[in-house]
């Protein structure tokens, strides 16, 4: 729509005005048209949306002014007369006008921009074209056509060139070649502070206990784990008594278990010389009493002749272990005789002893019963409803035990009619209260009732006490006090109660026939196998190879049915095996003849077509029918037949073997205290078994015995499996059928007895080893003895600290033990002679005490002659003792009878102490009142230096003793002693030591020798424990790996394969060889053994005892934490560990894991080590530092282990897979194995091929934890140190592992190269490259500088070392490494085991004058060889057992000088060049300075040569100089040749620390096989 403006025709504008109007009209027309379109569109769409004003569509023509249409509300028209200032024919509101104006302005800007572009772009294009085509060519043409002439002199030109070269050199030298100086600062890792979380309370007093019951609970721990009913039974009759200060109590008249609730009691014992009236001065020990007035007071009271044994404080027992055994076993018979009938020993009609306590017969036959004036705890009148009927097991009130003994014994009373007061449970013991004291007494009646009601609990308590009696009293007296004769006499005197001869009819021809079988088999085996024990073939063995529990049930039921159906029948049918023969055919293993000869009382045998019964009680044979057999006559020998030729069938031969087995079993059961007279007692035991604690032989599935059978190899232990199921099954059958428990036991054990032949000289039991079982001598003699050099064994001055075996159990002559010491000691050990103690004759039993108590043997038992024995495995004995408590009671009774008086008094004074983790035993500065011997656990002694710093004096594991020096010198404690974990101690009071010193001076001499040996060890090795004073960062972790007994394996976070890691570590332990073996524990093992309530509140006591027994049985226990972080088993692993291995994946996140947080929350002070698992044998530089940076609690170092692992967590107990999944997985495994060998993938990481399995990472870790690490110390000597590489190669070829490396100067360089990859090949290459750089004279010349501090800048030297190590840290090295330096700022020796490797290797190689000192945290470090060039003492302090020390230092010229009292320098110069001079050349100034610098190093070298366990090696490299690096190959060959010769010579001498099995050791192992029950 066009908008036109009407003008009058009369007015005609000029042309320019007309043009302007027209243009404006056009623009206005366009705007109007847009507005019209908007208006029409809005009207079309919606009239309501249109503006209130609009154009008039038909404006009438009027005057000259334009015609407008206004709305009434609009403002007046535009006042401006100019046409351009107001839009024609329209008027907009303010907002509309503003929009129009802004649009017009934008359009104006765009137009101007376009116009500018149209003007500028063409001009730019034009300029560019002209510049490139015209200007530049013109300028170049002009320049090239010019001729310039520069005139300079040579000086100016030289200066310019020098400036240019200097600039380039500076850039390359200081910006490109010194990258090593711009590495981020990584200082040495500061070793963590000692973790000390001790309790405020001390170990003797127990504050916070409010009543006597709490003190009773503390003292009752000696009984071990007690169930609630048993505990209530003991406590319900407990009585208390008040003692005023100074009151004495005659414990000899007390009967019961006494303990101190509150106060202090002194225990006195009668002196041996009490009866000597002519001697005076008997008084209490002044060394114990603090004042003489107290001694005088005691004398005035008439207590002369008594000596102070010990002082008993709160919660401690006044009774000894012996007293407890006496209370339990006071009415048990000592010996069961052969001709004692069961009817004569029946106690069913004997009244309870409580009803008649003063019976003369009772007092007579109960040696430990005492008439007590106070009858509060014993009813004087018979009471039927007070206590239940007395069990026959108590055997109380019976006149039978001694009256029916036809053979006089030494322990019998003279006359049974006169009542005689027997020996008390507290013989010759007197107690005196020092202060007002409250004591508690558990009367003897409580123990008798406990024996009747809970026989199994009683047996369990006795077993615990017997074990502690062995571990505390016997072991201490045997090895610590030197009372070997007294201890070993116990078992010797025990033989009079355990010796039972075989019946006469088993002598003569029967025995000869038995021997002939072994003779034939020995001839068949040959001389080599003849050194082993040969076991007689057991036909029932094939039955026992099946499931034991079902077969036991079948056997018991079959015996029962046989007894019911045919007591008097002839014989049962005989079942033959796969074939039969008509004679004794050695090698016939397939005979499975089943002889049904077990009845309720008799065993029937098929002999020559007749049925003969063997009476188990009397040992006589009677025929089933017909005329009497000659076998029934005692005088006739067995197997004597009529004159006609009688041929034995194979069945008859087996019957003879069965006769021997039955007779041997009868004798063994009598020796154990099980006879037909105890049938009712045993039945009572079975019936009460459910209410008693159930003990399981945890050793039954591990102790495997393999016999060399006369007819093949058999495994007698395959039969039993789980002893619990067998016990319960036989119990149920017995109780159901009413058959004699003894007979059922005999039936079960019939197949367990083995008849074994040992040739002369065979070792049946070895000292220090657990007894394999019980031996009954059929024919021959056994020799029991000890090595004669046992006392002289160097307990301390060996190459290692004393372990449990050294102090408590010196295992001298243990040929089977893999020794890690040198060959000389091994040869002396093999040549050690032995001293015979006594002989075991036919009918005697050996291994009685050790087999039942499961403790190590104090003696070794050998065959004096060719000997035939019956053998019952230890696991079977443990099962018998578990099911029949009378076995333990009988042993307890016999022990209390034969115990020497001296051992008894030691037992009274020795205190069994149990301390919790972190508890302080004594503080620094306390009075030395006792010696502590560690039975179980770990202690740490720390010294408070006063400035807030604490240092460790030592750690003490199982068998170590603490405090002898302080006790003997009566000095104060040098440090604070606290328990790292829950610990059991034997407290040896000073009062006992003083008492024994008066009556037994030999004990004082023994302990004096021990202290002297320790002092000599400290003097000879002053630096072994790291006592060399260095900087804090140079100190090694304060804990020690010596004598570790428990190791826990914990993951850092979930998903780490700790189970697989634990299994591999266990295998490595077994191959390395741990004394007494090693075992691993998982949660499943604990639950299988102790049940699902093992971690309950009550079950923890039982668990603690079980774990303590395991630690006693094995040399190392490995706890694998395979549960969640909050599981009880995880807490148990941490609490029981001497050392904790935190396993982490090296490529994982180094953040703190949840297991570590839990570990820190428990505040354990055990040693903690970090184990990083790598998929490949390579550690990235700086990776280890990331792991250790935030873990200051890692105080035991770290280990790099290569192990292939899965990224996803593998379940501990994987679910059973289907067959298809299993096959698929198997195929995938096979494919992966094939690809492993067919793929040609190039490894980018170093390859380490171990020539022997002992060089693996797990073996290295196992040796580290066992204290058997092999260390390599490399000395300094410049270029002569290249020989180190040859020696290392010789060590690798000899199969000697290297676990720790230490070096000085060039030794630190070579050692670091080898420790980085644990491979000699890359070390050789990098060392040769470095030698090439050092041999370059140009590099040396370019590095020269003004000799203010040194002749060179050290840059080329730094470059050569940095190119060898890069930015690797010492922590990244695969093997543990350290180097030493001399800190001239603080004048001390420092050791470095962390930080950049190149820096500290360079510092250790910094020769003064040639290279400037290295600045490290403000200190100047120089060559470590100035103080110690061969750091053997440092290596020894790290726990290395065997050390190879290679010395390549220069030898000083020691030619005597004679130039006089003054010296002219001119004469010295002339004399040096005078060939005719006879005087030696005096040293130069530099030589004097060098010798002065190495003065302390020479002394350290001499000490290193004499260090025990150090193998000193010095290759012949004296012909080479310090800087002869150009002769690399020659020096390397010299070292390699020397190493080969040295190791070959050492191998021939038997001194190599490797586990090689020579032919001699193989024969020795075969000879020693019987002691491990491998007969």
From Swiss-Prot:
Instruction: Please name the Pfam families in this protein's record.
Output: cNMP_binding (PF00027), NTE_Ploop (PF24179), Patatin (PF01734)
Supply the SMART domains for this chain: cNMP
Q: Where is this motif: DGA/G?
A: 1423-1425
Q: Where is this motif: GXGXXG?
A: 1276-1281
The chemistry this enzyme catalyses reads: a 1-acyl-sn-glycero-3-phosphocholine + H2O = sn-glycerol 3-phosphocholine + a fatty acid + H(+)
* Region (Disordered) location: 1-56, 339-425, 568-587
Q: Which residues cross the membrane?
A: 100-120, 152-172
- Location within or outside the cell: Endoplasmic reticulum membrane
Annotated GO biological processes are: lipid catabolic process; phosphatidylcholine metabolic process
Name the record gives this protein = Lysophospholipase NTE1
Gene for this protein?
Answer: NTE1
